[in-house]
């Protein structure tokens, strides 16, 4: 499984500690990747670049087993592009040719994942006929989308806000 965020930090600890959660049983493989490195790995795959060097993660457990090189006096790790057999993306609006428009933070990873996937499946909130989308606002051209469908039910999930208690002055 590849995901930018799979759970809140407290839930991540539970996932690691529970024997039947998959990690300890060997059913689930986890690769911890810094967020910027993850984005760049996807971007490189989308652009057809097989690998790149980054200083992120050098000197940590993330560096284990990776090629290391020095550039301008700074150590860098070689990271491989991250291709996907299937990319599942969600867009706000799309047309029947697969052209997609995303809203807000959905623009962060969805366009790159759509380009990095061998087969991209897009779910849209609104599916319109070809020609109804303004080409100036399309984030993912239909050439990258292999399947498109209109979603039916959406549950708005909000992260639980956690703050520290106010101290008395």
Label the model's feature ranges.
Residues 1-169:
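Conserved alpha/beta enzyme-core scaffold
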């Amino acid at each position: 499984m590849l995901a930018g965020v799979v759970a809140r930090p407290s839930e991540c600890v539970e996932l690691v500690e529970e024997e039947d959660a998959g990690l300890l049983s060997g059913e689930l493989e986890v690769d911890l990747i810094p967020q910027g490195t993850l984005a760049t790995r996807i971007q490189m795959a989308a652009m057809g670049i097989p690998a790149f060097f980054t200083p992120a993660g050098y000197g940590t457990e993330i560096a284990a087993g990776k090629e290391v090189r020095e550039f301008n006096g700074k150590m860098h790790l070689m990271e491989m592009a991250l291709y996907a057999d299937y990319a599942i993306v969600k867009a706000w609006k799309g047309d029947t040719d697969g052209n997609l428009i995303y809203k807000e933070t959905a623009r962060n990873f969805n366009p790159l994942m759509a380009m990095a996937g061998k087969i991209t499946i897009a779910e849209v909130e609104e599916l319109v006929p070809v020609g109804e989308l303004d080409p100036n606002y399309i984030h993912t051209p239909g050439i990258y989308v292999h399947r498109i469908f209109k979603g039916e039910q959406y549950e708005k999930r909000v992260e639980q806000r956690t703050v520290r208690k106010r101290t008395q002055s």
